[in-house]
Amino acid sequence: MAQLLSDIEINSQIGQLPDWSVVGQEIQMVRKFKDFIAAIDFVNKLVEPAEAAGHHPDIAISYNKVTITLTTHDAGGLTQKDFDLAQVISQLSRIWV
């Protein structure tokens, strides 16, 4: 099982991810796209990196707004896996916005 990060580690890493915020024991990113199709295209691009990492985000779609939430459920909070995948998602989101 992945090891939980300390508050100091979380604060350090979230500072390197300006698109993300800490919400309780999760990190979250919200992105708006030009329309529903662009939002769905972006979400579809997340499948491969999530599968490769063996770590899957919670995703909510509301028309052109996508909310992505990461936490490591089996560890009960935030681990390095969350921040690694957040970095990949941030890079992908810059292509689609």
From Swiss-Prot:
Keywords: Lyase
Coiled coil: none
Record bears the keyword Lyase: yes
EC identifiers of the protein: 4.2.1.96
Any one GO molecular function term: 4-alpha-hydroxytetrahydrobiopterin dehydratase activity
Pfam families, A to Z: Pterin_4a (PF01329)
Reactions listed under catalytic activity: (4aS,6R)-4a-hydroxy-L-erythro-5,6,7,8-tetrahydrobiopterin = (6R)-L-erythro-6,7-dihydrobiopterin + H2O
Cysteines engaged in disulfide bonds, as pairs: none
BP GO annotations: tetrahydrobiopterin biosynthetic process
InterPro entries recorded: PCD_sf (IPR036428), Pterin_deHydtase (IPR001533)
Protein family per UniProt: Belongs to the pterin-4-alpha-carbinolamine dehydratase family.
NCBIfam families assigned: PRK00823.1-2
HAMAP family: Pterin_4_alpha
Name of protein: Putative pterin-4-alpha-carbinolamine dehydratase
Lineage of producing organism: Bacteria, Bacillati, Cyanobacteriota, Cyanophyceae, Gomontiellales
